[in-house]
Amino acid sequence: MLRRSLAAVLFVLALAACGGQESSTPATQAAPTQPAPSAAVLVTTDCGAKVVTAKTPVDPGQTAMRALDRVADIETDSGGKFVTGIEGVEQNTGKKLAWLYYVNGKPADKGAAEVKLADGDVEWWDLHNWEKECASVPPDAE
């Protein structure tokens, strides 16, 4: 009987010694997943009034021209340096309509073959009168 009592006391002490202590091994947690880097291309006419190609994700690191070519059927001039048509919608020099492009809502200052898209960039192409700036930028183009 004494053995049983002693065994029971030792068992209770062992349980008490284990309780209340945090494990020294850290819990394994999955690292939060980061969204894949992405840029986007949007094509409109009349300063965003009509959507030709909805905002489409593309991989960053490629040129604006390459990204456009991947999401739309394009026609170019001058050895591929100038866009003259997108998805069958052609420029019209008689009406002073040209395809102009913007990055993050700002007019591009280089040719599309020279500008590389970064993560988060939005490339917006719009067919409008080249003598006028668009008064506003479509929400999807910023």
Task: Report the location of each language-model feature.
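Ubiquitin-like/PB1-type beta-grasp interaction modules and other compact soluble beta-rich domains
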Residues: L2-V12, C18-E142
